[in-house]
Amino acid sequence: MITDADTHHKYAINDFNLIPDYAVLEPSVTYGLPPQLTATTGMDALTHAIEAYIGRSTARQTRSAAVEAIQLIFDNLQNAYNNGNDKTARHHMLRASYLAGTAFTKSYVGYVHAVAHSLGGCYGIPHGLANSVLLPVILEAYGTAAHKKLARLARLTGISDSDLDAVAAGEFIRHIRNMNLSMNIPETLDGIRNEDIPKLARYADKEANPLYPVPVLWGPSKTEQMYHLVQEVNENDRSRNSEHPGKA
């Protein structure tokens, strides 16, 4: 990703010269990563895997990689956060990141990334933090369009044994919220200005449609709601945001 310094808009770039021949997964180089960066980069990898899985352009190989990545993250991220020198947890998180990368490189991502890119470009919000906060919010906003695949993930990873897709999907999203909570990841993002949201939503919508095979297409109006749902509101902003019922 690159950021246009004039427009503060992020763009994806790619070229065969940028594609590595090898990926070296050496856990020791991650031992010094601070807990909060461990948490948010780990949730970023989780976002890669989940968005690759629930999109409408998947293949058996990418689904398999995504599921393995999700399971590894569920099993190891908290340990890596608690103890940065846990070699086993660090090794499994590196593998999870790699697998999630192979999955989304072929099957793409979704609205979580589209919104996160706009926030990073405009405000410099760290990408992993933006994804961490947005992931459960947008998965919930997808509603029934994502229930079947989220429910399948919930059952495959042992999060739910419910036969009802809506219930299993809800338990999966709740598990993600609890992961964020356990690693002190906030529920909102500071600095989002009301006057910027329509422009940011247009950027995100243009990125998601037609670039990403998202579970459901929203349009700018629906996308705007995602910014309000994660917008940190202080006392000066509260009255201005009262017109947006999706934001407390």
Residue spans of the language-model regions?
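Carboxylate- and glycine-rich phosphate/diphosphate-binding segment that chelates Mg2+/Mn2+
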Residues: 1-107, 194
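A ubiquitous short alpha-helical element
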Residues: 33-35, 57-62, 136-138, 161-162, ...
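Hydrophobic faces of stable alpha-helices that mediate helix-helix packing
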Residues: 43, 47, 67-70, 74, ...
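Short helix-capping/linker segments at secondary-structure and domain boundaries
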Residues: 53-59, 107-109, 141-148, 234-238
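Amphipathic alpha-helical interaction segments
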Residues: 64-68, 72, 92-95, 114-117, ...
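C-terminal catalytic subdomain
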Residues: 107-171, 177
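C-terminal charged capping/lid subdomain of soluble metabolic enzymes
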Residues: 150, 160-248
